[in-house]
Amino acid sequence: MQRIRPYWIKFEQTGGAGMADGMSGINIPSILGCSVTIDNLLTRAEEGLDVSDVIEDLRIQAIPRFVCEAREVTGLKPRFLANSVVSLRVKPEHQETVLVVLNGDSSEVSCDRYYMECVTQPAFRGFIFSVLTAVEDRVYTVGVPPRLLIYRMTLFRPDNVLDFTLCVILMYLEGIGPSGASPSLFVQLSVYLRRVECQIGPLEKMRRFLYEGVLWLLNTLMYVVDNNPFTKTRVLPHYMFVKLLNPQPGTAPNIIKAIYSCGVGQRFDLPHGTPPCPDGVVQVPPGLLNGPLRDSEYQKSVYFWWLNRTMVTPKNVQLFETYKNSPRVVK
């Protein structure tokens, strides 16, 4: 069976009034043709693309999304903070240093210093996020039902400054608003990421995963605020589609929200009687890329997962398998 080429959608006028009257003969780029999605990769493979290239592109499909700092004090409810960093920039004279302004403070600190502060605090557990594919990220919700979404959530505690910094950048890009999404920030992060790429070894899978996530969010954010992305194939496809239907960032007609916010039914919901997430547990700014994190149903899933994570995720299971050199045996 021949696969339909998804690169372009063409509106043809077939009679009658409606949207097609004003869009007759207009070619609109398909979201599957403009973004590196799985469907597009299959199409490219059928057209003769080298298999190794397809595998390399498939590797970037998994994305860390809705990153929050996880903090918990014994006897108190946990807190998941996506608003702990209110400003971020790369130091001009030392482009491997990321400076941040923390919520409630006015002075800049380096991520190196912030990392040391966090790892010495008993309440700091690490970062939580969900692992989604590009097409599962649907702007206002996620394409994974709650009963399955909890198996996509993970807790990651960085053991080095670079991985910690990448988590902070992910969290900041998701929560940034229109006023903070500046060309200057985009250029700074692009230069920083080029330096980071040189520090990713073939076995450092987690670092590569975080790095690829930053690339997706950076290019998507640029597209949302009408800047040309550095890499157009790294724009999340549903953000492209919503942008075509509604060019004004940060707002959307009710019909678009309805399309992207439809539920999955009770069969795939969390167990009956699951309590909602208490107020104040998830603290999230009104960002351009964190719509689902502000949704009460997503927060409910996060809270349920946190309370039951030892049952959902076996103790010794890691997000990525790691390989270490075996000790040399001297004879």
Swiss-Prot record:
Its main location: virion. InterPro entries: Herpes_UL7. One of its GO terms (cellular component) is host cell Golgi apparatus. It is found in: Virion; Virion tegument; Host cytoplasm; Host Golgi apparatus. Keywords: Host cytoplasm, Host Golgi apparatus, Virion, Virion tegument. HAMAP family: HSV_CEP1. Belongs to the herpesviridae cytoplasmic envelopment protein 1 family. Plays a critical role in cytoplasmic virus egress. Participates in the final step of tegumentation and envelope acquisition within the host cytoplasm. Interacts with protein ORF7; this interaction localizes protein ORF53 to the host trans-Golgi network (TGN). This is Cytoplasmic envelopment protein 1. It comes from Varicella-zoster virus (strain Dumas). The lineage of its organism: Viruses, Duplodnaviria, Heunggongvirae, Peploviricota, Herviviricetes.
